[in-house]
């Protein structure tokens, strides 16, 4: 079935719908990963975005339950050159087209993804729309101009939980919070409050592997509630949207900084940046992929990282902050620590899923910071 992709600047591409009649809109971005499409589709950080995969064949190893990063697909649409309908892999349980259809997510193939990627790289990420029903490009362009811009959008409210929860295997289970606000933590584990702005499940697994007992909570979980829970440390997750819109969340982080060790990844990194006096700005086309080189300034080592963000943190002048990592493609900030408080954060994704594992030491480093704060 014929489908059109229109960008807000009038750029039009024609392709075929992967799963029948569809219409979807959002911010069009590109991802340079060769694999990992299931993890990308189910990453809540992609909420409100239409993802163009630069690798020409997507879906050849299918879909399985174990590679989910959340309970469902969060992207607005998937854009590929060719979608494989007959996957071949011993772990495959269903195909990519069926997976998209199950969650009613638009998909388009037959697109010149190289031309689209070049256009975005030169002109920046922009609003787009896919439709099988509207065949007049001019009508599509008029409609896409009504789509909200990513800047100024609080999409955390679309993906964050309303109440505390824990992860058992692949199941999200409501947490048993007592009437006094306390929680029964696991023995011999560090009690950890995780602010869930749209967390990926592999972050939780690696926190558990590092010796933490993570309890996921809503974005506006107060300092008083944290104290009542008995937690010893705070973790700020990834998530979608514009970090500058999360005023209340940033204020809560400022309060938490006075009492607890804190680590943040991706959106968590950006919110911590705001909390300690920095700002954020939108990147031209963002960093999305599993092959981004960064430099660890403490060791001098180069790490290949998994990334997914459209905003970056800036510190004009802050003597309390030490930059720990930079992006070697554009020299943007990739990580920082606070010189006097137990705070550390990275913009990239040390949990990978998908991507390389060069930066997974971040979780054990956070544990070391927490134990030092606790006097252990």
UniProtKB/Swiss-Prot annotation:
Molecular function terms, GO-annotated: ATP binding; carbamoyl-phosphate synthase (glutamine-hydrolyzing) activity; glutaminase activity
Top EC class, one word: ligase
Listed SMART domains: CPSase_sm_chain (SM01097)
Catalytic residues identified in the record: 266, 349, 351
Domain Glutamine amidotransferase type-1 as annotated: residue spans: 189-376
Region ranges (CPSase): 1-187
Keyword set includes Ubl conjugation: no
GO BP, one annotated term: 'de novo' UMP biosynthetic process
Chemical reaction(s) catalysed: hydrogencarbonate + L-glutamine + 2 ATP + H2O = carbamoyl phosphate + L-glutamate + 2 ADP + phosphate + 2 H(+)
Quaternary structure annotation from Swiss-Prot or TrEMBL: Composed of two chains; the small (or glutamine) chain promotes the hydrolysis of glutamine to ammonia, which is used by the large (or ammonia) chain to synthesize carbamoyl phosphate. Tetramer of heterodimers (alpha,beta)4.
HAMAP family assigned: CPSase_S_chain
Chain's role: Small subunit of the glutamine-dependent carbamoyl phosphate synthetase (CPSase). CPSase catalyzes the formation of carbamoyl phosphate from the ammonia moiety of glutamine, carbonate, and phosphate donated by ATP, constituting the first step of 2 biosynthetic pathways, one leading to arginine and/or urea and the other to pyrimidine nucleotides. The small subunit (glutamine amidotransferase) binds and cleaves glutamine to supply the large subunit with the substrate ammonia.
Name of the protein: Carbamoyl phosphate synthase small chain
Organism this protein belongs to: Lawsonia intracellularis (strain PHE/MN1-00)
